[in-house]
Each structure stands twice: as C-alpha cells, then as structure tokens.
Amino acid sequence: MEWETVIGLEVHVQLATKTKIFSGASTAFGAEPNTQACAIDLAMPGTLPSPNAKAFEYAIMFGLAVNAEIGKRSVFERKNYFYPDSPKGYQTTQLEQPIVGAGYIDIELDDGSTKRIRIHHAHLEEDAGKSLHEDFHDMTGIDLNRAGTPLIEVVTEPDISNKAEAVAFARKLHAIVTSLGIGDGDMSQGSMRFDVNISVRLKGQELGTRTETKNLNSFRFMERCIDQEVQRQIEVLEDGGKITQETRLYNGDTHTARPMRSKEEANDYRYFPCPDLLPVEITDEYIQSLRDKLPELPDARKARFIEQYGLSDYDAGLLGSDANTAHYFEVCAKACDDAKLSANWVAGELAARLNNEELAIQNSPVNAEQLAGLIARIKDQTISNKIAKQVFEAMWQGEGDADTVIEAKGLKQVSDSGALEKMVDDVMAANQQQVDAYRAAEPDKRKKMLGFFVGQIMKASKGQANPQQLNQILLSKLDS
C-alpha cells in the first residue's frame, strides 16, 4: 500500500515587545518565578486589559512579510478552558477576525524546486504560564511570568507532505521572524514552539483522521516526531485499527510522544467576544507605513549575497536565511576581506559545532571578529587549514584568539625552505624502496604515490609543514 502524509503546522511565535500584550508587566526571560505577573495578567477583579500597540505593529509586519491580507478590523475573543497555568480560566485570542489573513511562504526543496505553503491565518493572543515539574517532588509548580506575553499563532493549510518540507517551512518562518526583528526565535527559551497536525491516507483518498503533537521546540524534535507519528498511524491502519483524533505530547528527553487528551474543536472552548476589549481598526495608511520600513528579508538577502559576495546559490541561501547568521558572516567577511573563506567557515566548521551543541550563532564562544582573525592567519600562511581546525577548537574552549593560541601551542606553519628540505631528505632516506617505486611508476600513478610521502612528512612535522612549499620541494627531489 502506498501511503501519503498530510501535515499542517501551528507555530507560536513570542513577540519581542518589552511589555505584555494587555499589561505593562515585563516580558524579560529568566526572572524569578512569579515576579513578572501583574494583576491584569491574573485577571484580578477590577482590572482591565489595555492592548499593546507594538504587538499589533509586529503582527502586521509579519503579515506583510508573508504576502498576507491584513485584517482591517481585528477582534479579540475569549477561549474558555481550565488549566493550572492559565489563571484567568480563559485565553484572550482571536478567532473570527484575526489580524493576519491568508498568505504564503515559498520553501526550497532538496531537489532545488520551490513549493508554496499556504498560511490560513495568523492571530494575536496571550501566552499561558508555565508548569514546572522537575523542581518539585510529587507536585507541579506554576510560574506565571510568561502569562500574557504576546504571541502570534501562525496556522498553515495542510500543504506539507513530509518532515523535510515541515522543517524547511519552520526554518523559513524562523528566518522571517528574526529578520523582521519581531521575535528572537530562541527555541530553547520557548520563543518559538511548533504544534504538528499529522494524518496519513492511501494515495488518492480523502484526508485521514489527524492528531496534534504539541510544543515541539526544535527542528530536530519536529523531524523525530513526524517520523514516529507517521509510522505509528500507518501501523495502526494496516493492523485494521482506527486513528483517534487526539492531542499528543512529545517528550524531548525520551523522544517519545503520548496521548494527552482527546482533540478539541472550537465549540469545546465556547469562544465569545471579549467584553473588555474593543475591536481594533487598522488603516491603510498605517499598513503602508509599516510596509515602507520592512527590513531586508531572507530571499532578498540571498540574492544580494550572490551578487555582492559572489557566493554560490547554496551558500547564499544557507547564510542569508537567518538574520543572525547573515550578520555574523558579513562582519567576518569584512574583517578578513575574504567572503569565500568566511562562508566556508561559517557554513562549515562553525555551523557544525553550533548544531552539535544546539547553540544559536549569537551565543557562539567564537565571535565573528575572532573567526576573521583565524582566517587571516590561514590567508597569510601562518597556519594551514588542518592546523586551523585545532586552533578553532582551542578558541572554542576559551583559550584566546587565534594569535594567542598559535603562539602558546607553537602551531606556526613551517615555511623555511631549509627546514622543509631536511624533512623531505629524511623521509626519502628512510623510505628508499618507496622512492624507487615512485620513480619507476607511470606519471598517472605517481600522484597517488605522492600522498605517502606527504603523509610521512606531515606526521614528522606534526602537521605544520607548509603544504604548498612541501609539494614543490618534494616533487623537485623525487623527480630529480
């Protein structure tokens, strides 16, 4: 049987306002629990919410960036439910008239083609508090600092067909949000969270029953979740069972998901207009003023990187997709005056290390100026590319800048011709049989045999021999 996967995403994006969506309480991350929740956030008697104009500005900027219709009349509703981290007993959100209407994001697929993922809408709402389990024995603590933090929830159409497309969309959305400056996108702090709606069906059939897995806070978790849930649903259906429409919770420690509750529909929440908030009217002039100040977006930045720095389509897309990565690259490239080497290091060694340690580039132990200093030492042949990786590792561990590490560890490249000639003579004398075989070999076979001598000399020099000079001297002596 040939199964098809159908995926829709709901993405919660915390907006980078200084205060909450309906109160003046701070949104700063990391404060002591329950020190940033005011009477309005807790819906204490006698309090009234006051909408945060900056949240509307950021939501509209997002809508413009994703080619969406902007709601000229925006209305808030109450979504009624009881949960410990929601002190009001309801969430103030939008249902009938959201701030952002239908739009789309184009994603690039692995084969180089482009696919359009439609956005159904994006609405403003307040975040809930946070349940804390790990710090308590047989109890759950509640931290309400996050309650009332402004969110936009971005809801896609079910246009996504596999995990690669889901992650491509999520990355592109993340890039747009950070490029606009409307959110920091820090998933480790919950600034962007994904709910994944998944169903499977036999090819050509109607949509199957979907499940929703909530609160995924990394691209890696999203991939694993989709893999597991698709496989689970297929196994259930092939065994003759039925899929239960339910909400599931993913555990990032065990990489497993479990049922959380049966999936609710809108009627279950008894939405009704919020009596404390008037409808908000958005004028064409205001929308245009925000359109005029939109910053450079990922697709435009990619095109500029290709033209300005001569980067490949792949490198430009990789480095231009994220505002923080783009800034890091440009600072590095200008400091060392070498865009290509900067691109190679930022997209290669640095990106791999950040990915392994799940760090954002703005939190890298090696900043852009320091990486530029390392690249400068490669360019002036103080060190080789191989040694540069050792230097980078030491810099990552906080042992100083490139010059400090090179000096302290004695890693300067050996470029003295006399010293290199002696190394070559010693290796040739110790391996006369290989020298004779090289000289007797056909020219097309000598290149492979040359690697043996290079390897021996590099071993003797602890990788510090200048490769270009070494090759010249070695070839000269072997061919003589």
From Swiss-Prot:
GO molecular function terms here?
Answer: asparaginyl-tRNA synthase (glutamine-hydrolyzing) activity; ATP binding; glutaminyl-tRNA synthase (glutamine-hydrolyzing) activity
Keywords for this entry?
Answer: ATP-binding, Ligase, Nucleotide-binding, Protein biosynthesis
Q: Which GO terms describe its biological process?
A: glutaminyl-tRNAGln biosynthesis via transamidation; translation
The EC number(s) given in the record are 6.3.5.-
Instruction: Report the Gene3D superfamilies cross-referenced here.
Output: 1.10.10.410, GatB domain, N-terminal subdomain
This protein's superkingdom? Bacteria
List the catalysed reactions.
L-glutamyl-tRNA(Gln) + L-glutamine + ATP + H2O = L-glutaminyl-tRNA(Gln) + L-glutamate + ADP + phosphate + H(+); L-aspartyl-tRNA(Asn) + L-glutamine + ATP + H2O = L-asparaginyl-tRNA(Asn) + L-glutamate + ADP + phosphate + 2 H(+)
| Pfam families for the chain | GatB_N (PF02934), GatB_Yqey (PF02637)
Please name every pair of cysteines joined by a disulfide bond in this record.
none
Q: Which family does it belong to?
A: Belongs to the GatB/GatE family. GatB subfamily.
Known partners and oligomeric status: Heterotrimer of A, B and C subunits.
> What function is annotated for this protein?
Allows the formation of correctly charged Asn-tRNA(Asn) or Gln-tRNA(Gln) through the transamidation of misacylated Asp-tRNA(Asn) or Glu-tRNA(Gln) in organisms which lack either or both of asparaginyl-tRNA or glutaminyl-tRNA synthetases. The reaction takes place in the presence of glutamine and ATP through an activated phospho-Asp-tRNA(Asn) or phospho-Glu-tRNA(Gln).
PANTHER family, alphabetized? GLUTAMYL-TRNA GLN AMIDOTRANSFERASE SUBUNIT B MITOCHONDRIAL AND PROKARYOTIC PET112-RELATED (PTHR11659), GLUTAMYL-TRNA(GLN) AMIDOTRANSFERASE SUBUNIT B, MITOCHONDRIAL (PTHR11659:SF0)
In Swiss-Prot or TrEMBL terms, this protein is called Aspartyl/glutamyl-tRNA(Asn/Gln) amidotransferase subunit B
- Organism source for this protein? Saccharophagus degradans (strain 2-40 / ATCC 43961 / DSM 17024)
